[in-house]
Design a protein with these regions (language model features):
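Conserved Helicase C-terminal RecA-like lobe
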Residues: 1-118, 122-123
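SF2 helicase/translocase ATPase core recognition
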Residues: 109, 113-171
Length: 171
């Protein structure tokens, strides 16, 4: 930080170099998640709660493990029962999550998944008709596979399927 400040002409500095010490800046960065939340998190919570309050189940997609952890924590705070499927999820646990989600009498409201870990052999179309894309990696094959987790030709035409793409304006 100090190197950046010294690159500013002296007459424009006006004592700015004393605003934050290096340690203060490190502390702010370390505590960022405690003080700041992405705007999409608020929209995701609002949308998820609205759908779940109507008795719907929700499938949420994200491509980053840290983001999945943040979303899981934030939705759990809202009372949403959520499970996650990532590359770290063992096959047996994956099957248990899928079976519980597909069971209409279970209290599992949502699954959050990484497309690579949930791309094939997981059918959720009978229980879920709402897919929310928190972020994407723009891999076409993975995207098309993710769409089909809640939509099947010959199996889900009777129920409309809704996809939500959370994006920042002008992105």
């Amino acid at each position: 930080v100090k190197n950046l400040i010294t690159a500013i002409p002296p007459d424009l500095r006006q004592g700015d170099e004393n605003l934050l010490s290096d340690q203060d800046l490190k502390n702010l960065i370390a505590k960022y998640d405690l003080n700041e939340k992405p705007a999409k998190i608020f929209k995701l919570k609002e949308l998820s709660k609205k759908l779940i309050s109507k008795g719907e189940k929700v499938l949420i997609w994200s491509t980053h493990l840290k983001t999945i952890d943040l979303i899981t924590k934030e939705l759990s705070k809202e009372g949403i029962n959520i499970s996650k499927i990532t590359g770290k999820t063992k096959l047996k646990e994956r099957e248990e999550i899928k079976d519980k989600f597909n069971d209409s009498s279970s209290n599992l409201d949502a699954i959050i998944a990484i497309p690579q870990a949930c791309s094939e052999s997981i059918s959720l179309h009978k229980a879920c008709h709402h897919g929310i894309y928190y972020d994407m990696n723009y891999n076409t094959s993975e995207f098309l596979q993710s769409l089909d987790r809640i939509h099947r030709v010959g199996g889900s035409e009777k129920n409309p399927v809704f996809y939500y793409f959370l994006q920042y304006e002008n992105s």
